[in-house]
Regions:
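Extracellular glycan-interacting surfaces
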Residues: 4-426
Length: 426
């Protein structure tokens, strides 16, 4: 039953792909990050529009704005109006975060890039919104503290950096640091240390753009966790009240972090940063770059898939590996390169002969009857790799479609499309 519910969560996570229909396709090509884009420049441009007479953005102005908005319905005497939701009900939006409660697998918590936190206690049959109207709704990552006695604690990161608009990749959503719940997801508050309320005008807060957040289940004495943001990977030992930069410090745009059940940390930074590559650490402080020499020089966002039945095996699925990996033609007359590698840790720090790599990129679905049938991560906008807990050869990869391989993508003959566009769409 536990395995079934785990797979149900995986299936729900893939629903963002399932409901896509090609009759009126959205052009996501404009979402792709181009070299001229700069979050820092956009931040300064926004600041010029929002400065007060003294040349400052008033402290906590966004929070005050939302609080003021709460009073508007009362002032307009609309409190007696009754509203009924009329739909649509079959559109999940951009769900960046989803997890089930380890103490009750019927309880699911999901987070949307512009829709806030939602909670279900009946395995997704119905949902309740937990984010308050005066809070920012830009949820991008979510994690639960699974240590005994700590399961009521959850964290989520904020800020959609990949773009949340069908018409422009520059339309990213700023977040406001990290949020924490101590009542199993029923209510949430910001961790004030890293909110952007006190930012100087035009300043850039990397904690406004979180890619992923994970906790160390083995550290019983400290609240140890890791956060992947724009620019780098951060570590905390006090529940994200303070953070230290472990890798990065430059302009790496797409970054990720995952952790094994034994506390081994894997991180990835895109090629536009100084500390680019794939990294491994046994303690979160000493890091080794384990990236294979033949990987290629250009790469964007990477999804990390740890094999639960053998955590020495990790899959890395990377988007926009220009001139390296698998080439595919995509809809809207586009084209892309994607790479899939499998890493096996053997000894020591995992580098050189202490780790082996297998390039599985040639088995990524390509050259299908129509471009909608080919693998397409849309520049990393949608990217997923997961391993089935009790069958390590069953591996899932997701882009605009969701694919299932029964031989770990060691061939292209044992792969089936299980979600996304209707096969044969044109």
């Amino acid at each position: 039953m536990k395995l079934f519910k785990l797979l149900t969560v995986l299936t729900l996570f893939g629903l963002a792909f399932v409901m896509i229909r090609p009759e009126q396709p959205i052009d996501f090509n404009s979402i792709y990050k181009v070299p001229s884009e700069s979050p820092k420049s956009r931040k300064k441009w926004d600041a010029k529009r929002l400065l007060d007479a003294n040349g400052n953005i008033p402290q906590s102005i966004r929070r005050k704005e939302l609080k003021f908005a709460q009073s508007l319905p009362n002032d307009l005497n609309n409190s007696n109006l009754l509203w009924t939701a009329e739909g649509p009900y079959n559109v999940g939006g951009r769900t960046r975060a989803l997890a089930y409660d380890v103490t009750d697998e019927n309880t699911l918590i999901a987070g949307g890039a512009s829709g806030g936190i939602w909670r279900s206690t009946n395995l997704g049959q119905s949902w309740s919104k937990m984010t308050k109207p005066f809070q920012l709704h830009n949820v991008t990552c979510l994690t639960q503290d699974t240590r005994p006695g700590k399961e009521n604690i959850w964290y989520y990161g904020t800020g959609e950096l990949a773009g949340n608009s069908a018409s422009g990749g520059g339309a990213y959503f700023d977040g406001n640091g990290i949020y924490k719940s101590i009542d199993n997801g029923l209510s949430w508050d910001t961790i004030s240390s890293f909110t952007s309320d006190n930012n100087a005008a035009g300043s850039f807060n990397v904690f406004d753009f979180a890619w992923n957040i994970v906790l160390d289940p083995t550290n019983l004495d400290e609240d140890e966790g890791y956060l992947a943001t724009y620019g780098g990977i951060y570590r905390s030992i006090d529940g994200f009240n303070t953070l230290s930069l472990e890798i990065g410090g430059g302009d790496a745009y797409y970054n990720n972090v995952e952790i094994t059940s034994t506390g081994v940390v894997y991180a990835t930074l895109s090629s536009d940063g100084a500390d680019k590559g794939f990294w491994r650490s046994a303690d979160g402080m000493e890091w080794a770059n384990i990236m294979p020499d033949s990987f290629g020089n250009t790469y964007g966002r990477t999804a990390i898939g740890i094999n639960p039945s053998d955590e020495n095996e990790i899959y890395f699925l990377t988007a926009e590996t220009t001139n390296s990996g698998q080439f595919t033609n995509t809809f809207f007359n586009g084209e892309t390169w994607t790479s899939l590698w499998k890493y096996t840790y053997l000894c020591g720090d995992g580098t050189d002969s202490c780790g082996t790599w297998v390039n599985l990129s040639q088995n990524i679905p390509a050259n299908r009857p129509t471009t909608f049938d080919n693998f397409n991560a849309q520049g990393g906008y949608d990217l997923l790799v997961k391993v089935k807990p009790d069958e390590p050869n069953v591996v899932f990869i997701g882009g605009t479609n969701l694919w299932r391989s029964t031989d770990g993508f060691t061939s292209d003959t044992n792969t089936a499309q299980i979600g996304g566009y209707y096969e044969g769409s044109d």
